[in-house]
């Protein structure tokens, strides 16, 4: 039985998380520090998001800083504490990834962090795209009991990474491969059809002008790094709905094809159908 496609929104704020829920997103990944690739949000953000998200699952990125994924002992302890806080605040899942200097999955550190997760779902984030051997890394991640991998297929965008994404899906059915980076309503169906994936990660943000009336153009809070002081990026419900619409059409086509195949091959047992339904229920729990 074909799985229903799901969208995870990379929410850069609680406001974005709420808009993602309003648009029908299955899950949000709550992040701070988007220009750095996403860092751990604050206690207050996690708590408020948990209070407001009652229809959409809440995952929290655990990343103490931007940059690489080789973490110092102090950073490792910070990650451990942040995982415990996310769990205590009621997050449905956490998102993290750690590498060695040689570009391999840091299995001992990952196992230490996994021990703190409890019942939360776990996504190995785009540290995967920095692994020196993606297929070996995937086996290590599966061995850790992680639920899914967020990846662009080790390319600049998920669309460019379709060949590797497809290989990873075909390599094994024990873990969810979730394409992310550059995914939008214009390419999500193509990525879905060419890779066989059913979960997708994107931001769907639009820029909103600041409400500030007085603006001092001589000063920037980013110092020498130019950051738009008076624009705010927020999840755009219309972009989320457009992507969901594309996936809904794909899912309907898949169902029609499945029905046609069943009519041509009616020998599948009721027991096999029951097994398929159980698999779908397990996916919904993640």
Please name every model-derived segment.
Residues 2-13, 62-78, 123-134:
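Active-site mouth loops of central-metabolism enzymes
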Residues 12-19, 70-82, 132-144, 168, ...:
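Catalytic cores of alpha/beta
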Residues 15, 34-54, 74-76, 99-118, ...:
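Active-site-adjacent beta->alpha loops and helix N-cap segments on the catalytic face
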Residues 47-85:
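Structural motif corresponding to the early beta-alpha repeats
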Residues 5-9, 28-30, 58-62, 94-96, ...:
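Hydrophobic faces of well-ordered beta-strands that scaffold small-molecule active sites
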Residues 173-255:
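C-terminal alpha-helical cap/extension of soluble enzyme domains
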Residues 21-28, 53-55, 90-93, 116-119, ...:
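Glycine-enriched alpha-helix->loop->beta-strand junction motifs that scaffold or abut catalytic
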Residues 27-39, 85, 89-101, 146-161, ...:
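Glycine-rich phosphate-binding active-site loops on the catalytic face of alpha/beta enzymes
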